[in-house]
Amino acid sequence: MSTDADVVVLGATPAGIAAALAAARHGKSVILLERSAHPGGLPANGLGATDIKTRGTVGGLFLKFTRLIRRHYEETYGPESAQLQLSSDGYRFEPSVAEDVLCGMLREAPLVSLRTMRQFDSSPENLEMENGAIITIRVLDRMTGAVESYRARRFIDATYEGDLAAAAGVPYRLGREGADEHGEPMAGRFYAAWFGEEGSGALFERRESWKTRHNTRPRTE
């Protein structure tokens, strides 16, 4: 079986779902392929909390996701419920709730076709390239055992391991290069001082965190 679309996204991780929704917003037909039966990546498979403390920086599709999570707990258990409080304004959730919310977001995008149980094995023989670009990939339907071909103008690798990129011959390395190789003096350092808006329920204390990590005071100007 061969199927065509403007965009094929490999991996229904949060990044893959966001990419699919963004492409659909621009009027592109999208096929979203997921290896497992449960789209949503880590949040839908056990990682029930986000570690974003600087919630004033959150926007876009992720902000919509947190608001839908919050609405679920408020409508299901009530505005004064412990469940709503424990959801930390939508930043903490049960994996099943995360999956339901993400699938609901996909259902709102008719140009996106989600296909689960589609396995891409990271091998050059499972794709076709033309002028250095992928034009076709082949995946296994894990339910039927059939091999399916997907053609698209653009392919997006949203797997956690970079399976599609590796199969296409994109250079990669294991580990991390030195900061001098690309002139990145800040690489590998985590700067904890945040002077923007704090999210409700966040445990982040910018001054104390700065003192602990740097044994100094943050700038106040």
Which residue ranges define each predicted feature?
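Residues that mark the start of a beta-strand
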Residues: 6, 27-30, 153
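Glycine-rich FAD pyrophosphate-binding loop
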Residues: 24-45
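Beta1/beta-strand and adjacent pyrophosphate-binding region of the FAD-binding site
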Residues: 1-13
